[in-house]
Every structure is written in structure tokens, then in C-alpha cells.
Amino acid sequence: MSDIESIVEKLSSLTLIQAAELSKRLEEEWGVSASAPVAAVAPAVXXDVAVAEKTEFEVFLESFDAKSKISVIKEVRSITDLGLKEAKELVEALLKSLRTGVSKDEANELKKKLEAAGATISLR
């Protein structure tokens, strides 16, 4: 039996506690770490490749000022073409998407209108 086969056989017979102790002792003896290496970040690709900018956004109603609830409902109705009851339910539910798949400019315009009415809006 070769030395390597002998070592493999002995290591295979170790218990988990013994293997952990062996690992710790070898780290101390050799000055190395058994932890997984950290992945390096890939270098940036040449400047010819443009970074893809997000083109479609989703407008979310995060919260609203209680005093301006009616204004927010009116604005939601005008944006979504919902009826009064549906718009009220949507506003009261919070954290709901008001519009999806809108352009950046349209999303920012909707955000301005809703914030002027007293809502807190996020774009995703």
C-alpha cells in the first residue's frame, strides 16, 4: 500500500470531531485557512458594451397622508380608469401596483401627480 493510500484510509476512519481537530491543527501548522475562497469580481467589460438601462417600470403606492385620502383616490381613478369603489379599495390596500410596464418618463410623471395628491410612491 502506498503512503497516499495509507493516509486516505486513516483519514476516512476519522470521526467528525477528529477531522475538525485535524483541520484546525493543519491551519495552525501551515498558516492557511480552510474557509472557501472569496470569488473575485469580474473585471469590467470594454466600454463598447453599453449598460442596459431599465425601460419598464411599475408604480407602487407605498402610503398616503390620511388627510389627502380623497385626493389620492381621485388621482388613482384618473390614472387607472377604475371606478370609485375599486380605486378606494386599491388605495386602502397599500403596497399595490398602480401601473405596470410604463416608461421611465411616464412613471416619473405619475409619481409626481400622486405625490402632489399626498401619496408616497415607489418605482420598481
Swiss-Prot record:
Function of the protein: Forms part of the ribosomal stalk which helps the ribosome interact with GTP-bound translation factors. Is thus essential for accurate translation.
Single GO biological process annotation from the record: translation
MF GO annotations: mRNA binding; structural constituent of ribosome
UniProt-listed Pfam families: Ribosomal_L12, Ribosomal_L12_N
Organism for this UniProt entry: Liberibacter africanus subsp. capensis
Protein family according to the UniProt entry: Belongs to the bacterial ribosomal protein bL12 family.
Name under which the protein is recorded: Large ribosomal subunit protein bL12
Record keywords, A-Z: Ribonucleoprotein, Ribosomal protein
